[in-house]
Every structure is written in structure tokens, then in C-alpha cells.
């Protein structure tokens, strides 16, 4: 109450300064007048709702002032005035809170209505979405294996069933007609996709194999001309390189039988024919004949001789059968002297005699005067020189049969085979290797024991006294000679393949043959 008393004293001092103190007996008018400004001040400080509350204590204070004195009156109203003010001040925070709550409460319903509207709209949207989702959502129908089998069977019968048939299928399968229709739609889509893929494969399939077949079409054609009934068969190029390392023995693209042209471009294909030939022959150092020679057929395998590489590099060879190689002309005939035959010249030497039926070799007589002796008869149409091997297989037997016999020969030498100009007959290798033999039919001996005459065999290669005496010899003496030599030399030398052993047996065999020839000549002269 102290602050209220102080306020009352101040107010009393102000009133005393303004107006003189009156007597104790004053009417209610001035008291009411003094109370009115206080009430006005209080009304200014307080709000409108407080006005009704402030009037009530003023009425009380007026009654109290009328009953009490001036001090009391002054004190009472102040106290009363202060009391209500304090009460008002004490009550102002809750009132303010109420006032602050009132507009908030008044605003809450609006906000609540707006929120409720928004929430209601959201609920409606959710419901609408749920409704639409329910319409869009499709449940997958799960079919059993028996149902799928039945549907597949019906689909193979009819791809487009009508409504009546769909109803029947639905009753059979146990699924609604709508689901049956959907299943058939999906099945038709799958069927169309498979059909398109098959069409693409059929279109692209024949195109690629046709290109491949056109590219590789020449390979089977090359194999058609090759003989299929021959036992040896074609030799691969790798084996040819290993066995015959020199280039003349290989067939190149220029030497093929028929150059095939491929569809994409013209390119020659090297075809390796089967190398079918008689037993291998050593290649020698003497040149080939200089005359025109018929084209042979097949290249025979020839073994390398040391010292002959410088002469026969990039040269072709004449052989039996059909071949592309042609006999080359040699300009170094003078260089090939008799140095290779000095070792064999000790056995005997003679000069070639001009034969009337060999006009192609007149120059060889002067260029090659020294040749080793050869004691056996050979067909006259073939200039036959001794081979390098000590054992050489003749294409005919000594008894006239087609078996092969081996005869001795000097170490260095060469075999020159000249195909005749006559028609070719059936030869000893017709059933083994070659289709055609190199020997003519009229020169085959019925028996080699016949006397040497017009049908003699190489009389020009024999020494002159031998040729003269043997032309007059009887068939019995020659038969005995040839049979004896065949028994002795053929049996002993046919089993030997090594060159050292054969060269050691070479000279004694020839000496025995000479002795027997002399004995036969002596017997013929005595008769």
C-alpha cells in the first residue's frame, strides 16, 4: 500500500496547490468532481472493458467519502482508486492473455476451416487416385500346365477364335472369356515375332552361304581332274619340299595343267599332280639331247648329286609321262668334258658310231668321245648311258618278262631317256605307276637271246669288235651268256643298296662278263 499512499499524497498536494482547502463539510459535488478526473485518467490507462469494472469501485468510494472525513475521503478514494487500479493492474495480464487468446481463437476457426477444406480435398484426391488405380491395376492370371497345354493346342488349330469359341474355351479351361481373349492376343503377338525372326533368318541365311560357296568354289573343282583310283595319291607341297628341295622339281603356277580363274579375280592355282614314276634315278651331269622331244607326262623323283647343283639350277628335266617341263638347250656342252668319266675310262673306251635311225645326235659323237662300256643289249631307239648307281633297275627282265632286274654300272654317269616318235604301247609299269610306258612296242624283245641284227639293242654303244662278233653270234650262245650273267650278277647285286659295297663288286662282275664274252666268241669262232 505504500506506493498508493504516495500517489494519494501527491494528488492531494496538487489539489491543494490548485484549490484552497475547504471546510470538512463539503458537498458531494466537489468530491465527485475530484473523483471524475481520477476516473478519466484511469479510463485513459485502461481499455474499454475495464470501464465497467472501474465504475463499480467509484460508486463505493463515493459512498465511503460521504460517510467519512476529507482525509479519509481523499485517502479512501485514492485507496479505492488505487485499489481498483491495482486490481486492474493485477488482473491485466490474464485479461491481456484473454484478449490475445480471443483473436487467436477467433482466427483458429478460420484456419481450421481452411485446413479442414484442404484435408477434405486431399482426401477426395486420394480417394479418386485409389479409384483410378483400382481401375488401372491388372491382376495376372496364373495358368496351370494343363491349361497352357490346352490353350496351345487350341491356338495351333485356330489363331483367331471368335466370342463363341472363347466362351467354350473358358468353360473348358476354367478362365473367364476376357482372360482367354487376352491370352490369345499375347500368343498371337509372340507368334508374329517368331515369324518375323524366321523370315529374317531365311533371307540372310542363303546369302552368306552363297558368298562362301562362290569364294571356295574353285577348290573342289581343282580336285575333279585328279585321278581318284591311284594308290599313292597327290603329294602335299611340304613333303615335296622335304624330299625334293630344288626348285626345278616343283610345279609352279606357270607349270600347272589348267589355270583356273576364280569368280572374284583371275588368279592361278598350283595343282600338284601325283608323282608316279618308276624307281628313283640319280640325276647326272651330262646334258639332255638337243632335238625336239615330245612333252612328257609325269616328273619322276630324282635324287640330288653333289656337284650338279651349279649345272641344273632352274632347269627342267625330261621324264616319263606328261609334264609341263620342256627340254632346255644347253650352251655349256664344251664345259662338260670327260673329267667325270676318267675313273670309268680305264674299263674301256669306244667312240659312238653313227646310226642311221638316230639323226638327232650327230654332235654328241665329237663332243663326248669317251663313254664307259655297257655290256648288255638295250633298245636301239633309246640312247641309254650307264647310271651313277652301281645297281640300276632295268624296266624289263633278261628273259623278256616285265620284272625288274638290277645290273651294275660305273659310278659317275647319266641316263638319257629319249621318248620315241612312234606310238606308245603297253609298258611294264602300266599296272603300277604310269599309264603309258616310254618304250615302243616293236622294240620289245620276245627273248633277249635273239641275235643282234636289224632289231639289235644299242649296237653303237658296244665296242666295235663286240658289235661285229655278236651280230654273227647264235641265239644259243647269247642265251647262255645272258642267263649266266643274270644268275651271277642279278642274285648278288639285287640285294645291295649301299653304294660302297656295290662299287666294290662292280669291277669283278664286269671282268667276269668280259671273260665269258671272250669264251663265247672263241666257241663261236671254232664252230
UniProtKB/Swiss-Prot annotation:
Biased-composition ranges, Polar residues, are: 488-506
Show the segment(s) annotated as Disordered.
1-126, 194-245, 271-306, 488-527
User: Which GO biological process annotations does it have?
Assistant: oogenesis; ovarian follicle development; positive regulation of transcription by RNA polymerase II; transcription by RNA polymerase II
Q: Which SUPFAM superfamilies match?
A: Homeodomain-like
Give the UniProt keywords, A-Z: Developmental protein, Differentiation, DNA-binding, Homeobox, Nucleus, Oogenesis, Transcription, Transcription regulation
Keyword Acyltransferase carried by entry:
no
InterPro entries assigned: HD, Homeodomain-like_sf, NOBOX
Instruction: State the Gene Ontology terms under molecular function.
Output: DNA-binding transcription activator activity, RNA polymerase II-specific; DNA-binding transcription factor activity; RNA polymerase II cis-regulatory region sequence-specific DNA binding; sequence-specific DNA binding
Provide the tissue specificity: Specifically expressed in ovaries and testes. In ovaries, expressed in oocytes from primordial through antral follicles but not in granulosa cells, theca cells and corpora lutea.
Localization (cell):
Nucleus
Specify where it is mainly localized.
nucleus
Fetch the PROSITE patterns from UniProt.
HOMEOBOX_2 (PS50071)
Q: What happens when the gene is disrupted?
A: Male mice are fertile and show no obvious abnormality. Female mice lacking Nobox have normal gross anatomy and histology, but are infertile with atrophic ovaries that lack oocytes at 6 weeks of age.
Q: Its GO CC terms?
A: cytoplasm; nucleus; transcription regulator complex
Provide ranges: composition bias, Basic and acidic residues: 194-203, 511-527
Residue ranges the UniProt entry marks as DNA-binding? 136-195
What this chain does, per the entry, is described as: Transcription factor which plays an essential role in postnatal follicle development. Binds preferentially to the DNA sequences 5'-TAATTG-3', 5'-TAGTTG-3' and 5'-TAATTA-3'. Directly regulates the transcription of POU5F1 and GDF9 during early folliculogenesis.
The identity of this protein, by name, is Homeobox protein NOBOX
Q: Which organism is it from?
A: Mus musculus (Mouse)
Q: What is the lineage of its organism?
A: Eukaryota, Metazoa, Chordata, Craniata, Vertebrata
Point out the gene that encodes the protein.
Nobox
Amino acid at each position: 500500500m505504500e506506493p498508493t499512499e504516495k500517489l494519494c499524497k501527491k494528488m492531494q498536494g496538487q489539489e491543494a496547490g490548485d484549490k484552497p482547502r475547504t471546510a470538512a463539510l463539503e458537498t458531494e459535488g466537489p468530491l465527485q468532481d475530484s473523483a471524475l478526473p481520477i476516473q478519466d485518467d484511469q479510463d485513459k490507462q485502461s481499455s474499454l472493458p475495464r470501464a465497467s469494472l472501474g465504475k463499480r469501485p467509484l460508486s463505493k468510494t463515493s459512498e465511503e467519502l460521504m460517510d467519512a472525513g476529507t482525509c479519509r475521503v481523499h485517502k479512501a478514494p485514492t485507496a479505492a482508486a488505487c485499489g481498483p487500479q491495482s486490481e486492474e493492474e493485477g488482473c491485466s495480464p490474464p485479461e491481456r492473455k484473454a484478449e490475445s487468446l480471443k483473436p487467436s481463437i477467433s482466427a483458429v476457426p478460420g484456419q481450421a476451416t481452411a485446413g479442414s477444406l484442404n484435408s477434405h480435398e486431399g482426401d477426395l484426391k486420394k480417394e479418386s487416385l485409389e479409384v483410378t488405380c483400382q481401375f488401372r491395376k491388372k491382376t495376372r492370371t496364373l495358368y496351370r500346365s494343363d491349361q497352357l497345354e490346352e490353350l496351345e493346342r487350341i491356338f495351333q488349330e485356330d489363331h483367331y477364335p471368335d466370342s463363341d469359341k472363347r466362351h467354350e474355351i473358358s468353360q473348358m479351361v476354367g478362365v473367364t472369356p476376357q482372360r482367354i481373349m487376352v491370352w490369345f492376343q499375347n500368343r498371337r503377338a509372340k507368334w508374329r515375332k517368331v515369324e518375323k525372326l524366321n523370315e529374317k533368318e531365311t533371307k540372310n541365311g542363303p546369302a552368306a552361304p552363297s558368298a562362301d560357296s562362290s569364294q571356295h568354289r574353285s577348290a573342289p573343282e581343282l580336285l575333279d581332274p585328279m585321278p581318284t583310283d591311284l594308290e599313292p595319291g597327290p603329294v602335299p607341297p611340304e613333303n615335296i619340299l622335304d624330299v625334293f628341295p630344288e626348285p626345278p622339281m616343283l610345279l609352279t603356277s606357270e607349270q600347272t595343267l589348267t589355270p583356273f580363274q576364280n569368280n572374284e579375280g583371275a588368279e592361278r592355282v598350283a595343282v600338284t599332280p601325283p608323282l608316279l614314276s618308276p624307281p628313283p634315278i640319280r640325276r647326272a651331269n651330262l646334258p639332255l639331247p638337243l632335238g625336239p622331244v615330245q612333252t612328257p607326262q609325269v616328273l619322276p623323283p630324282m635324287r640330288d648329286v653333289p656337284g650338279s647343283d651349279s649345272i641344273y639350277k632352274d632347269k627342267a628335266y625330261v621324264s616319263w609321262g606328261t609334264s609341263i617341263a620342256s627340254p632346255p638347250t644347253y650352251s655349256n656342252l664344251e664345259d662338260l668334258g670327260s673329267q667325270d668319266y676318267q675313273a670309268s675310262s680305264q674299263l674301256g673306251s669306244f667312240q659312238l658310231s653313227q646310226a642311221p635311225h638316230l639323226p638327232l645326235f650327230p654332235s654328241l659323237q665329237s663332243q663326248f668321245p669317251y663313254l664307259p662300256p655297257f655290256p648288255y643289249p638295250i633298245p636301239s631307239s633309246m640312247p641309254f648311258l650307264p647310271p651313277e648307281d652301281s645297281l640300276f633297275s632295268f624296266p624289263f627282265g633278261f628273259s623278256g618278262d616285265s620284272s625288274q632286274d638290277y645290273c651294275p654300272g660305273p659310278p659317275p654317269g647319266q641316263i638319257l631317256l629319249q621318248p620315241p616318235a612312234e606310238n606308245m604301247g603297253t609298258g611294264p609299269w602300266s599296272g603300277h605307276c604310269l599309264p603309258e610306258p616310254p618304250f615302243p612296242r616293236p622294240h620289245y624283245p620276245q627273248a633277249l637271246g635273239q641275235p643282234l641284227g636289224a632289231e639289235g639293242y644299242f649296237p653303237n654303244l658296244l665296242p666295235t669288235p663286240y658289235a661285229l662278233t655278236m651280230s654273227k653270234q647264235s641265239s644259243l650262245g647269247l642265251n647262255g651268256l645272258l642267263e649266266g650273267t643274270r644268275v651271277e650278277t642279278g642274285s648278288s647285286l639285287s640285294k645291295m643298296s649301299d653304294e660302297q659295297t656295290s662299287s666294290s663288286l662292280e669291277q669283278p662282275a664286269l671282268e667276269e662278263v668280259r671273260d665269258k664274252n671272250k669264251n663265247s666268241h672263241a666257241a663261236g669262232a671254232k664252230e
